[in-house]
Amino acid sequence: MSPVCRRLVMTVGDSRVGKSTVIKLLIELFLSQNQTVKIYNHDNRNKFKAYEGIVPVESLNFFTDNPDLVLDDLLNDSLDVIFVDMPGQYIQETCNYIYEADFFTVLAELNWKLTFLQPISHRSDCMEYFLQLLDFATDNANYVIVKNQHFDTRFKEYNQLVQQKLPLIGGTEIRLTALHRDHYQGMEHLSKPYSQCFHEQSLYVLYRSYIYHWLKNFFDAVKNNQVASIYLEAV
């Protein structure tokens, strides 16, 4: 067993709220800190194709394939962080997968910590999924909410249902600032890691500047939040 506590980060919640985007941003942050990362991707749309030459990316249907593939990697001493990008909306199936794999026990025995990372939009479904997950996992995991300002800046449902509860369970929130759709699409069309996009000469200088500051703002949001910096980084 490794004496160092490592981190498994599982993205959960609604569909199309920015889960893969947040993972890509965190990959950039971890790689800048010389941490070794692996991704398990439930989606078959190759969302992480731009990163395949940088970090291991493995496709896995968590509801039909063998979950031991993920469990086996917990024995890999070379890994610092494992991302598991769960499918959106399937929160009950996600809980069932964790229960059937006895995930909480295995992680504790192998000295891994679990973080549930949930980007949210303005939709009430996001909060319903989170509360269901919290009721299931209780204190077996850490919790980070990412307020994706691409959708809204007010987050009324979050403020009413979750915001006051989050610190009581040791959870925290961070903010992902909005990036204009044209800038984001221009970056995505390059099919390159985000950190390479603001050096890309084919993009307008203004686009590159906005992309650079968008990345920097997110990195600062993680680093300046003491709780998030623990829950989202191997320590």
Model-derived regions, located:
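Conserved catalytic-core segment of NTP-binding enzymes
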Residues: 92-187
